């Protein structure tokens, strides 16, 4: 057994290989800070920082344009939501269960939607004002309530893939909302760990975690009256970040009008800092993890929004999850503390 030490300002964390526990999933990430400056002769991504016009006649998501299925978009003025023309889940899917020895398959029902953040083809969330992002937040709330209320829908996943390097098929500012009958793998892990902690402590694990982070703030990059933006202690991606409400809430429907405004502010601050980091339109995948819509109490849930950006050391060098990370566990070089310092310095 090892004697516990105070992790604050522990120089071992900045100099030696170690692993860190993700309290939400129970998984570990290997941290190798001494590798941060290793030479790079690998792949460099193409930098697509060319200026885009506010309207693209060939874009399927621009206002007034016709989508691939023949439907015409309305001339929307702010946020536009529609059912995905190429949905990954089918509402009418047969809820079958098929078993053959060790082989098992279950039918999965769901509804997938696309949410256009703005009619302006050239904008990302980082380019939008908090009041504009607030309209996106309101749309997320409406869709979460509507989809979560559909019979047989037990989970609603809100997410965004930004940038071609993240597999985004259209540069128009947009995200997606997938709702389904079962809980996804990541959500199952987070549900179990949050429930276990809540049963023992009658408090949410993220509430206690945020309270601890706010003591020294070495991983906190921004906070307002209701939200904390930080690099999680267990972050996997180089500049991974998380937005967490200071008060325990199980989903975004519990946000007051003022809290929704402060959520939009937190998103604006983080995404603008990202763009300044390498002077580019910073790619990432982001998503909101919140309580299932299965009709259960779910008071152990503390919703949060994660940002997983791939860029490592420049606008053209990204982190690859390969080799050991595919067969062993995730690994990172730059520490969460170093990443937090860099991002915090970019916030006005």
Locate the predicted segments by residue.
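Extended C-terminal subregions enriched in glycine
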Residues: 262-281
